[in-house]
Curated annotation (Swiss-Prot):
The gene is nusG. Belongs to the NusG family. One of its GO terms (cellular component) is cytosol. Participates in transcription elongation, termination and antitermination. It comes from the Bacteria. Pfam families: KOW, NusG. This is Transcription termination/antitermination protein NusG. Disulfide bonds: none annotated. GO terms for biological process: DNA-templated transcription termination; regulation of DNA-templated transcription elongation; transcription antitermination; transcription elongation-coupled chromatin remodeling. It comes from Staphylococcus aureus (strain NCTC 8325 / PS 47). Residues 131-163 form the KOW domain.
Amino acid sequence: MSEEVGAKRWYAVHTYSGYENKVKKNLEKRVESMNMTEQIFRVVIPEEEETQVKDGKAKTTVKKTFPGYVLVELIMTDESWYVVRNTPGVTGFVGSAGAGSKPNPLLPEEVRFILKQMGLKEKTIDVELEVGEQVRIKSGPFANQVGEVQEIETDKFKLTVLVDMFGRETPVEVEFDQIEKL
């Protein structure tokens, strides 16, 4: 199977059951601390909303579509492979044929199907923001803070906003759906 070297692809990673959220957080922290943002792009836990009606009341819960697995979008290099494999809670890549062999990526149609099930699609967000514009953060720990867009990372669907904290401008990383343009 010939594969483009340096191509951004999706891989399925096996985790301890119930550790998906921890693995996602750990991996995202490792990507930042090890300067791997140019090789490891997104970590997604496949899940979907399920609505059940009990006693006449609808209750919506989020259910993991593939318990024990997370999807990681990355460029497969020795370094990115090492970072993911050695993240606490990760037991290995799916499609790896044995010790030392790199895994096969998921097929694009498989990824599209999974992301569509989650309501994500292969995120193509039309960003009508520019560096220097003022935005309000709608959710998260910095909700209702107003700041200036410092950096836009369309491939990760994140942006860096400078907010005033304790009299200093502090960069805060937020996702596109967490902000609104002023």
